Amino acid sequence: KKDPANTGDTQKTEDTQKTEKTEQTDPAGKADLAAGDIADNMTSADGKYEIAFVTDVGSLKDQSFNQGTWEGVKKYAYDNDKSYKYYQPANGDKATDDDRFNAMKAAADAGAKIIVCAGFLQETALRKAAETFPEVKFVFIDGYPIGFKNVAPISFQEEQSGYLAGYAAVKE
């Protein structure tokens, strides 16, 4: 492109500028991708997955809890060169504790070192999985401590987001 001052110098295209910026700020050569731009599964050379996500009820791309958690898992795995995969318990919204455990077991059997489980409904299955697979680390999203050293609970005060959203709306 010609520059706006018509000095005859050419300007770099946006793509070239983005590439140069990525090379300068990203020594690993990775672009700063949004989670939605990252593939849904990435295997390691041995075909195993280091990080697994077991969904809560509903679909993976529910534009809510599962999707937000999954996008965070993908982004972390991508940024840290980890392989990853998601598992949905059988029977969808009617999933039982056995269905949830079987999804966690499938993830552990596939080589997952970290399994992220979303939703408080995972607790019973997670207790069984944590005991069955003590070498696997579990992240319990929307859960409370359940007494296992290999389980890291992450809970949040859901009402706070509604309060803050309301406050932000009034302030605008």
Model feature map: region roles:
Residues 1-5, 9-172:
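A residue-level marker of the well-folded mature domains of exported/periplasmic proteins
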